[in-house]
């Protein structure tokens, strides 16, 4: 482990192979607490590279319990934007599943916010502690399955205490959203910092992803924002490109940021139920913007505004609420 730590001390990036080797040592419980501490803090102070992130993802995926499903999408973001918004990507995942898109959602309970995806799904009476075969069945039947990260990544136990001791963001906050136990090859990923857009795209390019959108909005969300421009980096078939989504030009008509602020799991779940029943508000529009990205990445649409309009028509019909009841009954 020391050879990698010494390289990081010299502010040198690790290669993909070196990163894989280092994370193998970490995830096999062969590194001391001091080595884990040095490795994670030095990576953070240097700035994590795409090869370092990809190496970590490769190992974490390899050691996770496996969910065997085909052609699914995930909408798992990094979190950590500090905005305490409603659960936009979780709501967009449920909307997409109601629209016929197979979603293997990977997530956790709250870390920096009041309510993570696991918390809000529990508040909606959706089971989050399912085994792989149950999730496979649920996706087959209802187009939606949730993989609760701690149940699937037992190797994380070796680094958990040191991450707590460090007490701030580490490379694991970036590795987690990319480490789906379902090995999805289509993703919409929100990131907490604009500078991660291309880093994530290059990391995913090492990992056999067919189509991904990595997003960060100019008002600081790790989502597509209904209020301000969102920077998007697209990875499709090995090619990386950039674009901008402007809600003013798209005539989204959202009013004020306060309308997206969340609270505890019960509050957030009730807001989600309201929009699934067809209530039209800023939260509904934000969810449809992010679902539109999912429709693009699933290759059901090629034009963003068309995908958005289809998501709007669907959510306002109330059908999402009826489909949610099927997921709750599992």
From Swiss-Prot:
Entry binding sites for Mg(2+) 2: 222-223
Binding site for 5-phospho-alpha-D-ribose 1-diphosphate: 77, 80-81, 85, 87-90, 105-113, 117
Pfam family, one: Glycos_transf_3
Binding site for anthranilate 2: 163
GO biological process: L-tryptophan biosynthetic process
Annotated disulfide bonds: none
UniProt keywords, alphabetically: Amino-acid biosynthesis, Aromatic amino acid biosynthesis, Glycosyltransferase, Magnesium, Metal-binding, Transferase, Tryptophan biosynthesis
Cofactor binding remark: Binds 2 magnesium ions per monomer.
Enzyme nomenclature, EC number: 2.4.2.18
Obligatory cofactor(s): Mg(2+)
GO MF annotation terms: anthranilate phosphoribosyltransferase activity; magnesium ion binding
One GO CC annotation: cytosol
SUPFAM superfamilies in alphabetical order: Nucleoside phosphorylase/phosphoribosyltransferase catalytic domain, Nucleoside phosphorylase/phosphoribosyltransferase N-terminal domain
Positions annotated to bind anthranilate 1: 77, 108
Superkingdom to which the source organism belongs: Bacteria
Residues involved in Mg(2+) 1 binding: 89, 223
UniProt-listed InterPro entries: Anthranilate_Pribosyl_Tfrase, Glycosyl_Trfase_fam3, Glycosyl_Trfase_fam3_N_dom, Glycosyl_Trfase_fam3_N_dom_sf, Nuc_phospho_transferase
Pathway where this protein functions: Amino-acid biosynthesis; L-tryptophan biosynthesis; L-tryptophan from chorismate: step 2/5
Family listed: Belongs to the anthranilate phosphoribosyltransferase family.
HAMAP family: TrpD
Quaternary data: Homodimer.
Role description: Catalyzes the transfer of the phosphoribosyl group of 5-phosphorylribose-1-pyrophosphate (PRPP) to anthranilate to yield N-(5'-phosphoribosyl)-anthranilate (PRA).
Protein name: Anthranilate phosphoribosyltransferase
Organism: Pelagibacter ubique (strain HTCC1062)
Gene transcribed to yield this protein: trpD
